[in-house]
Structure formats: C-alpha cells, structure tokens
C-alpha cells in the first residue's frame, strides 16, 4: 500500500455512527411474511379460486416488492443524510493530525491501527465530507429481535437485520419472483398441479426473503434449509417422470453434503463467539477475539456449504440436472434464490472469511481458488451442451465462480454487484429459453431450434440483450460488474492499476479466460437457436410463433434492467463534471460501513485492463462467430457443426471433447465408483451382519426360549404344579370314600351317637376357649 492510499485509509475512519431508523426498515419482516401467508392461502383455498391460487401468489409478492422498494428508498435516505447529522468538531482536524505524522509513524501506526475499521467506502464518505464540512459517519444496520427462549444463561433470539446488503437482496428477490409468477401463469397454464406449483413458488420466495433478513445464524440455517426443501419440491414438480424425481433427489442429497459443513461451521462460530448473532460473530472475528485457526476451520466448513449450494466445483453436478423442473423455477433458482444463497452467506459473514483466510495482503486462498477453477471449468462444459437450459446452467455455475473468486480476493462490493446485475440478465436468458421451448416444445438447440429470430422477434431481441450483458461487453450491466471483479484481484500491475487486497494474479488470468469462454459458448447458443434454418418439428401446429404478453413483458423488463443496472456503480473517473451522484453509488449504499464489516481496500479502475479484457472477450465472440456463422453456415444453413471438424481430425481434441461430454467424469465418480462401489460391499456386509449376526442371535434366543418353555412345562408345570393339584384331589377323594365307608352305614343310633359326641366336643371347646 503506497503512502497516498495509506493516508486516505487512515483519514477515512468514521468517528461517529448513526442508527438507521424508519417504519419500513423496522417492519421489513412483513416482506417474507406476505408470500408465506400466500402459501397457506393457496394450499387451503387455491383450487376454489378463479385463477387457481395464482392471484394470491402474485398479489403477495407484488406487495412485498412495494415494501422492498420503500425499504431501499428509506435506507438510501439514511445513508445520504448520515453525514448531515454531525458537524465537524474542528476543521480538517484529522487531516492535520496525519500531516504532522512522520512517514515512518504513518507506515507503522496508521496501517496497523486504522485498517481494522476503515473501508474503501469510508474513503469516499470522507472525501465528500471534507468538501462539505462534515465528518464521515457510519450507518448501523436496523436490528429488531425478541427473545424466543432462554436457558443456561443463553438467549435464543429471533429477529431481522436490515442494511444495504439486505435491502438490495430484498429488491432483487421480489422483482425476479414477481416476474416469474406472472410468466408462470402462461408457461404452466393447464398444468396438472398448477395450484401446487404456485404454492411452492410463494414458499420458495418467502424462504429466501427470510434467509436474507436473518439476524442470527440459527435463522440462517433455517432459511438455508427451507430454500433447499422448496427447490427439491419444484425441481421434481413433474415427479411422475423418473429423470425429474432423480434430479430433485440428486439436488437434495448433494446439498446435504455441504450442509454438514454449514452446521459444523456455525456451531464452531457459536461456541467461539458465544453468540448466535451475525453482528457479534463478525465483530469477534474482526477484533481477533476468535483464534485464527478456529476461524480458518470455520471458514473451510462454511466453504463446503458454498460448494454445494452455489454449485462450485466438485459439488456442482446437481445444478445442470435441476433443469428438469419448470423453466420459471430454473430462472428463480439461478437468478435470485437457491444458488445465490451461498454467495449471500459469505457476504453476510465476511468478517469470518476475510480474517479466516487472511485475504488482505495474500495471493492465494481456498475461496479464490475454487471460484477461479469453477468459472473456467464450467465455461468449458457449457460448450458441449445441446440443451439450451443446461448451457445456461453451466453459465450460472461459471458466473457464480466469478462471485466466489471476487469474495476470495477481497472484492466484496464487486461480488455483490455482480450478483445484482447477473440476476437480471440470467433471469432474462432462462425465461427467454423458456419462451423458445414453449413454442417448439423442446430444449434441444440442434434438433428443435434454428432460425427462431424470424418467428419470435421479441424473444430474440431480449435474449440478445441479456446475452451481451452476460458476455460482459460494454456498455451493458455485465461489463461493469465483471471488470470490477478483475480490478479487485489486485494482480494487474501490468495494466497500471493500484490497490486491492493482495496480488491474486491467478484469479485475474482465470477471470479473463472465463470472459472469453462466456462469449464463445453464448455465440454458439445464439447461432444454434436463432440463426440458420429451423430444424424442429411443428407437431402439426404450423410454424413456431411468438409467446404471449405474460411471457414477453417480463422479458422486456429484464432486458431493460440488463442494460441499466450496470450504471448504478460507475467507476470513479468514468465521467467528468459533477457526476458524484452516479459514481460508485451501488457500493456507497450497499457496502457496510460499520464495526461488523472488515477493512477492505478497493483497487483503482484501470481502463487499460477494461480494454484488454474487452478485446479478449471480443476475440471469443469472433472465433465462435467465424466457426458457426461462416464455416458451419456455409456447409449448410441447417448444419449445427462441421462434418469434418477438429474433433474428427485430432485425437487430443476428441479426447478433450469426450471428457467434457462426460462432465469430467464426476457423475461417474460419484455414482458408479463411490455410490455403487460403496453400496455393494456395504450391502453385502449388512446382509451378512443381518443373517449371521442379528438373525443368528435372534434365532438362538428363540431356541433357548423354546427349550426353557419345554423344561418348565414338562418338569415344573406337569410334575410339580399339576402333581400337587392332582395329589390333593386324590387325597380328598380317598378321604371322602373312607369317611363314607366308615360313617354312612344306614344305622340311626350310630348317627345319633356321632352327633352327641360332636356336640360334646364343640361345647367343651367353647367352654375352654371362650
């Protein structure tokens, strides 16, 4: 860090903080509550309604969107007015203090003492405040909670945490969810479980919104699992077909692997920090109240959860198979719910990851490595997919790799900004693919598509816009967020840049390669889907036709957002004049300026890097366009690849193509080797244990019990018990017979003598004893 940057960082420390307030922020719990309520209304009354419950879901999520927008406005107002609440106590006091400090003291003291609480956003606030006469002020998150129960001195609380990150996600989730709801009314019209679909769509949205607002890690776990359960239900919506139910089960089980890491990591954080609160845990991590080794172990465990939920390499295999669900569900999963939950969790607990992986001043960590490898590996897999939804699925895996990589290099704002922009253009692409499939009744680009631009002009135009945004080409949204990630790697001194949290050269190189791959495989998608000749079957319905308004209007809205979203965080220096209201606005409102957020450094923008990455991306477009639009089209407008291409000529290329087609053999590894390889021996061992062990013991116990019963019956019951009873009976019988023989002889005088004797004896006994 040079002296100028160090001075700016030191001067940026906010000396005061204000508590954000406002009715909408404090009652943000209504936002997830509304779709949760609609879930129950649809279940109980949906089938009786005119639109089979869809009206409940759409109304609820629309109201949630209105509340989310109000929260966004209220939060922006709080941040903008924060510095106006406090006048500077003395003019330029902080600046004079540091101007009098020697360069050596500045290097030794300012770096170690102020970096713990400063951030790049704080620099911006100070810079603005320096001119206006106000000092930088931190805006604390709105936290509303109540004690659920208390035991052993530990309080279990439930509440909400609302800050810039939360309100941004509330807006994204509600916007995408509302458009998906509207789109679905046409797409799944006439479905055999139409009401069931909308019920779980509402619950899915509510679960993600609950997760976003979680104030503590217990709520985070609950929201995390609810999102997983809803995705399982919706991926397997058409469960009668075995591939669909298998895909749902695969998604569920794969995520269980990562969830074990989530539980272990959260337990470690609770016992280390002594609190469930996300704020308390982050503060403890940042202030070194938790040991480095403990933070590292917790970070590794939580990273395992990110691998499964966000579809990162080696646990990404479930995500392409999840395309078995309805296309609107795929859009919601990939743009605003399931997979971005992993990114959000890292962003929310960033103090833990930043300190645990020692991101500042480093050049390597697990997050950066996983993200870098995933974005390139998934990009290569997208090349060989014929199913348009699977191409987009691997594209999502790749783009999530960008976000994970950005978080790994300390580019927090860049990662979250890319999550924001990606939500709009990826939702647009999935819904666009659904529009095409709705017309041709297939997702196979090679067999069922081609030339679709002539039949579906609106879908084509919106798909092109969202594709350019995904490619990261200027001036659309993806360009600004992707290049901010590349800047954040800090490994680009070659391009004249400064700053960053370390020198992550490998991440930078992989990020640039990933940009070229994205452009190349999306060019292939554009050609196979919209150019050439139509290769599909009309199924007796005539030529394909454009979708209805309930499908195309959401596409238009998303394409507009794919254009404009990037301008919310323009880099400083991009425009001249009074443009501070447009420069880095996203980071200004979203990046926390509080004690629960670590001190991260932002790299300065480099137009050299931006131009270079754009040239590389355009090279990817050019190579793919030359192959498909010129070579393949020249062979035949109906062709989808060259008959005598590289894979037919070159053994190495063919082998590489086979590896990609087999998805790096990961499914083979998991299913055939690990699962089946374990299942056979384990099943045999379990059978032997059951037959020889458990059954043997049970059978032996049974035999011993039978022998014991026989002994008791023969020796005790028959001889002893029955013998005693029989003997007493025979004795009574003998006595009676003897008495009868002796006494009862028919002589009256003998009876009288006996009666007299008996009376005499009784009288004597009476006299003696009474």
Residue ranges and their predicted role:
Residues 60-78, 258-267, 463-475, 554-577, ...:
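Hydrophobic alpha-helical membrane-insertion segments
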Residues 37-43, 179-182, 379-381, 521, ...:
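Alpha-helical transmembrane segments
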